[in-house]
Amino acid sequence: MPQAVMQGKNQKGGEKLELLRNSALAVELTGDQCAVLGELVSIRNLADGDVLVKQGASDNRLFVIVSGALAVARQVEASGEWVTLHTLGKGDLAGELGFMDGRPHYAALRAIGPTQVLCLEREKLESLLKREPVIVYRVMRAIFRVVHVILNRMAMQTSELTNYIFKVHGKY
């Protein structure tokens, strides 16, 4: 392989590894473990409005937002308009539930402006189970930590909304 092509590949591999090291997935990983996981992830660049995952589609990929943002959005059937339910930014994970259980996505993931994400397919992570089980364990811990934060936030929002609706605790 020509030297220039090899350097390009090494540069992209180094960039990908650096992006992975700075992500929530790598919080508990050593440098060597990051390198192993880095071989499994890919980088995807999206333009404004690109749909990363379609509403109702099953998808086995986990995404880490490297730059830009993703809208968690549903398309209104009657009008075709998009309704944004939540916005995910740099450092956030997306698609974690579909990654874990393969169920169809309740909402789509759409790029807000130019967006770059790291992609990890479930099958690729599972391929490490026998030879690198610690990496799989630590990545899954990272995913569950993120899901736990989301669930806590949703519980707090539900509580605040309930208090508001029923005018509980004299806050409203």
Mark where each language-model region is.
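Cytosolic regulatory regions built on CNB/CRP/Popeye-like sensor folds
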Residues: 1-172
